[in-house]
Amino acid sequence: MNKKNSIDFFGASLLVIFSILLGLNQSLVKIVNLGMHPIFQVGIRSLVAAIPVIIFCLLFKKKLSISDGSLIPGIICGSLFALEFVLLFFALELTSVSRSSILFYSMPVWLGICAHFLFEEEKLNIKKIIGFLISIAAVTIAMSSKANISNGSVLGDIFALLASFLWATIILMVRMTNLKKSTPEMQLLYQLVVSAIIILPLTAYLGFGLRDITISIMFIFLFQSLIIVAAGFLIWFWVLSIYPASLMASYSFFGPIFGVFFGWLIFKEEISITIILSLLFVSVGIYLINSKNTN
């Protein structure tokens, strides 16, 4: 499929579905943390998710190559991916789903700002700047909930925010290094395989592993590994290869909304009018960010 300068209905639908899955993922990770140490969960999830991705590539004859100059940036991205999710999983151990989701999905702000300076075709115009400001306001409104503040951990907040920086860095590396020569499947495998290679030996050395594992926790773990990580991120990298990074990433502002919703649904975390307002602001912000430049 050819590159596009704006996001059409099909692309928007995929991004919204992906945002729903990511919002749900925050709650699922917190549940699985009860049965697995956070670091172990990151490593074993990467390993389990890599298997169906490899099978998919073999069945559909997707190109998997390290001879295109992508090996070094791929290893770096895989290392960043490992650190990103270790930080996020610990954040979910320390703070509420709502708060960690809101901070983690601030990623489009850092990505949009960096893309403005790094990519000539992704300059921020007045409408997009206003859109970003409105979206940031939406995140701020959601964070202003008294329940979020009282249940929050400063260290957990910092971990979630650092994880969002790493997510933006990975996206930029895909755009700016030889990783862009790799297929979306290969880009994902770099991250899954490298993170598994780094983390699993580390957890064995440190003695981190299973906690109070149950059948239901195993089912949830498999769902997030196979559906959210394997299938979801394949879609994410494919969309990244078609649509402008700053525009598609703006849809991640739906992430904290769905994260807060599932936090309320699963953990009974408080939801209020501020969440409804933040959803409205996010919708307006995304509309402005996706508006085309006019002469």
Regions found by a protein language model. Name each.
Residues 7-12, 34-39, 43, 66-71, ...:
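Juxtamembrane helix-entry segments on the extracytoplasmic side of multipass membrane proteins
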Residues 21, 25-26, 54-104, 140-141, ...:
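Specific transmembrane alpha-helical segments of multi-pass solute transporters/efflux pumps
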